[in-house]
């Protein structure tokens, strides 16, 4: 069972379209966005997920000012949560947050098998004390690299894909 992880798309529509195409090509149990979508119209790039029966959820980032519009546009696709999103997939407990502030305490809590975050625009994949994943940035504005992560929930590993 696999989880698609994307974050910090920051309205780079060309890169967002490419990233979602990559996600759709995988056999995913779910896709999560770890925040900083920016504009509500970015929802149209995720619109194919329900047709493929891939559940979606996200969390707001610090740059997501138009929360009402984002929630409304994403409503047919999946929910966007205020601070955190928790889910169990394949017997694995997963939490998604935007900022890195709580990553270490969440990872050490023993409550989660996977902690996903965004915000820093830097790839981070660690396996101790649990799987910690920051997919980097989909928008590519800061680093010049657009990346996402595919998390294998069977062996608790993550692969970074650049696009």
Regions found by a protein language model. Give the residues of each.
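Core catalytic region of metal-dependent phosphoesterases/phosphodiesterases
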Residues: 2-88
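Active-site-proximal beta-strand elements of phosphoester/diester hydrolases
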Residues: 2-10, 93-99, 131-136, 160-161
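Active-site environment of divalent metal-dependent phosphoester hydrolases
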Residues: 10-15, 38-41, 63-69, 101-106, ...
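Alpha-helix C-terminal capping segments
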Residues: 23, 49, 106-111, 125-128
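Hydrophobic/aromatic beta-strand patches that form the interior of the parallel beta-sheet core
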Residues: 32, 57-59, 114-116, 131-133, ...
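Internal catalytic-core helix/loop-beta-alpha segment
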Residues: 82-122
């Amino acid at each position: 069972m696999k989880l698609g992880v994307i974050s910090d798309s920051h309205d780079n529509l060309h890169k967002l379209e490419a990233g979602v195409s990559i996600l759709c090509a995988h056999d995913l149990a779910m896709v999560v966005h770890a925040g900083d979508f920016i504009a509500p119209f970015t929802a149209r790039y995720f619109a194919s997920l329900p047709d493929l029966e891939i559940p979606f959820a996200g969390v707001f980032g610090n740059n997501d000012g138009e929360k009402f519009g984002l929630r409304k546009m994403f409503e047919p696709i999946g929910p966007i949560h205020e601070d955190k999103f928790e889910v169990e997939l394949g017997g694995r407990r997963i939490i998604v947050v935007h900022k890195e502030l709580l990553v270490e305490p969440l990872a050490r809590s023993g409550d989660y098998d996977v902690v996903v975050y965004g915000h820093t625009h830097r790839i981070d994949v660690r396996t101790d004390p649990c799987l910690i994943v920051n997919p980097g940035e989909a928008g590519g504005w800061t680093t010049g690299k657009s990346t996402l992560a595919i998390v294998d929930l069977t062996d608790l590993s993550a692969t970074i894909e650049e696009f």
